[in-house]
C-alpha cells in the first residue's frame, strides 16, 4: 500500500474512516459502526465501502462483530475482481 501499511489500514477499519485511491478512483471505507441495545450491548456491526468517483456502494455488510465485518471486507473481491490483500499494493492511502 502506497503511503502506509496495509495492516494499519485494516486495523483502522475497526474504529475510523479511511480513504484510498485505486486505479484512479477514490474510495471511502466507513469504519465499523455498532448498533447497540438500550442496555449498551452490541446488537450488530456494519462496515461499508463507497466508490466516491462513481457514487456507488461497493461493499456493505452487517455482522455480529467488528472482526467478522473486517474479515468479510478482506475476502470481498471488490477491487477489480481482487480481494484486499491481492490489490493493496495498487492502493494509495490518502486523506479525505
Regions found by a protein language model. Name each.
Residues 4, 27, 36, 74-75, ...:
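N-terminal cationic amphipathic segment used for targeting or macromolecule association
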Residues 14-52:
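Amphipathic, interaction-prone secondary-structure segments
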Residues 10-11, 21, 50, 71, ...:
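N-terminal non-cleavable signal-anchor helices
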Residues 39-72:
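Intrinsically disordered, low-complexity regulatory segments enriched in Ser/Thr/Pro
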Residues 24-27, 32, 55, 64, ...:
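Short linear sequence elements within intrinsically disordered, low-complexity coil regions
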Residues 1-19:
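Short acidic, Pro/Gly- and aromatic-enriched capping/linker segments at domain boundaries
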Amino acid at each position: 500500500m502506497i503511503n502506509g501499511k496495509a495492516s494499519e489500514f485494516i486495523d483502522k477499519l475497526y474504529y475510523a474512516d479511511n480513504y484510498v485511491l485505486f486505479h484512479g478512483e477514490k474510495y471511502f471505507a466507513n469504519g465499523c459502526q455498532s448498533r447497540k441495545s438500550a442496555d449498551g450491548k452490541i446488537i450488530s456491526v456494519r462496515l461499508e465501502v463507497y466508490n466516491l468517483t462513481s457514487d456507488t456502494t461497493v461493499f456493505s455488510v452487517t455482522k455480529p462483530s467488528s472482526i467478522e465485518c473486517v474479515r468479510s471486507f478482506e475476502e470481498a473481491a471488490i477491487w477489480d475482481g481482487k480481494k484486499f490483500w491481492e490489490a493493496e499494493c495498487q492502493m494509495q492511502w490518502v486523506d479525505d
